[in-house]
Design a protein with these regions (language model features):
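Beta-propeller domain segments
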Residues: 36-81, 118-119, 126-137, 141, ...
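Conserved beta-propeller blade signature
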Residues: 106-108, 180-183, 232-236, 288-292, ...
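C-terminal motif of bacterial Sec signal peptides marking the signal peptidase cleavage site
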Residues: 32-34
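Short loop/turn segments immediately following the C-termini of beta-strands
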Residues: 112, 186-188, 194, 238-240, ...
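Blade-level signature of beta-propeller repeat domains, shared across WD40, Kelch, NHL, RCC1
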Residues: 429-454
Length: 454
């Protein structure tokens, strides 16, 4: 179509074109929501240390099954497992995603979301995915701050809230080493001085190491955990794509856990082939590093399951060339038979598309003894599985330092009977009293789970 030079008709033409583009986007989103395949095996069959892995089911239109975000109405809350109770520790937050407990019991929360990206919404697929994420509650601007919450009277509810740090760049992971607080922004590992009991830090963060970012920054969250001696930081960095469709050169130092020297910022790959590792935790008995990983999409509701695994130095876990060890992903070209041959299967599978994000080992005494050494996991919930999976907090029992048994639901009810998401759990931590704290980025709440003594 050729536009005229008259001002008014041109504006009308542009407005008309935008209406058409919007209609096309709505139609594409509706088609995605109504089409796609469904799971062929029960979710339970794809969980554990010997999961069923059906054949890939690639479809022209990927499966989309969104739980629209609506938040919690007054007086409502998630449902705690028998023997537990839950209440709001803090509400009215701005997209709280990650948590860190300080030695004095104060709780840090990263109020954050994805940074703006030049390529957001480009093309029909990009526009549709942007629409999907907004509907799922992930479309809010980033507050770019870390807030401090304090329960001064010990009643299980935060009675003081302060902005500890602001002006950050999509912060996520936090780790305290002596008097230094490390923050993982979406593009850099930063550090600020910390004084015990401080409620505000005005010192400008100092750069420790630049992290993979760039114009795509597909998986933007960066988590960080310190070694026991404080000499090294371990940073979880997700991939820049689903299965390297942006080119393998865009994946440098991504889909990996990086090891950073605390004194000079020197950095190296600790382990690779982990599509989107998020939660990081040291096992309290063995001292091994563990992570939860979000696996790849668009080969069906049954594949590929997210997982929990110990992380070995120098190990390769398959992405993008294979999954669950040496199951080759035929979409990736050129293939790498040498890397596939070395790929390690994860220790424990959590289920397809559950979006496992939070990870915390229990090493306290409020909960019964059988929870000691086991893992609590925040499952943010699927957007591309029929039926949905995740949207809950689970506990994975451990024995002798390894997962042992089927996951137990600890906190459910995040999706209502109409299929709407009242909340979505993300980060999980154990507070100084031994209660479990859960960040809910759709409900804008931090939930506190306690055990009721008999």
């Amino acid at each position: 179509m050729q536009w005229t030079t008259a001002t008014t008709p041109r504006r009308l033409g542009l407005a008309h074109r935008r209406r058409i583009e919007h209609a096309v986007l709505l139609l594409a989103t509706a088609l995605l929501a109504s089409c796609g395949e469904s799971a062929t095996i029960p979710l339970r069959a794809g969980i554990g240390d010997a999961p069923q892995l059906p054949k890939p089911n690639s479809t022209l239109i990927p499966t989309v099954n969104i739980a629209p975000a609506i938040g919690w109405s007054d007086g409502t809350a998630p449902t705690a497992a028998a023997g537990f109770q839950v209440r709001a520790f803090a509400a009215g937050l701005d997209h709280p995603r990650w948590l860190h407990v300080l030695p004095n019991g104060d709780v840090l929360v990263a109020e954050t979301n994805a940074p703006s990206k030049p390529q957001d919404g480009q093309g029909i697929k990009g526009a549709v995915m942007e629409s999907v994420m907004k509907k799922a509650g992930a479309g809010v601007p980033s507050a770019n701050r870390i807030s401090l919450l304090r329960d001064a009277d010990g009643d299980g509810v935060a009675d003081m809230r302060s902005v500890l740090l602001d002006g950050l760049n999509s912060p996520f992971g936090m780790s305290l080493v002596d008097d230094r607080l490390y923050i993982a922004n979406s593009d850099a590992l930063m550090v600020v001085p910390y004084r015990n009991g401080a409620t505000r830090i005005d010192t400008a963060p100092r750069l420790v190491a630049a992290l993979p970012a760039g114009p795509i920054n597909h998986h933007w969250t960066k988590n960080v955990i310190a070694s026991a001696d404080g000499l090294h930081l371990y940073v979880a960095v997700g991939s820049n794509s689903n299965v390297a469709e942006n080119g393998i050169e865009a994946e440098q130092n991504r889909a990996a856990i990086l090891e950073v020297d605390a004194d000079d910022g020197d950095m190296r790959v600790f382990a690779s082939g982990l599509r989107n590792p998020v939660g990081l935790a040291w096992h309290p008995t063995t001292g091994a590093l563990w992570t939860v990983v979000n696996e790849r999409d668009e080969i069906g509701s049954d594949l590929v399951p997210d997982y929990l695994t110990s992380v070995r130095r120098g190990a390769f876990y398959g992405w993008p060339y294979s999954y669950y060890g040496q199951h080759v992903d035929m979409r990736v070209a050129p293939s790498r038979a040498d890397l596939v041959a070395s790929a390690i299967a994860p220790d424990y599978v959590l289920g397809a598309h559950v979006a496992a994000l939070g990870l915390a080992f229990y090493d306290s005494e409020m909960f019964p003894a059988r929870y000691r050494g086991g893992a609590f996991i925040g499952e943010h919930g699927s957007w591309n599985r029929k039926p949905r999976s995740g949207y809950k907090v689970v506990f994975v029992p451990f024995a002798n330092g390894k997962p042992n048994g089927y996951p137990e639901d600890i906190l459910t009810g995040f999706v209502d009977s109409g299929g709407n998401a009242r909340g979505r759990p993300v980060g999980v931590v154990v507070d100084r009293q031994g209660a479990l704290l859960v960040a809910d980025d759709v409900g804008n709440t931090i939930w506190r789970v306690t055990h009721m003594p008999r």
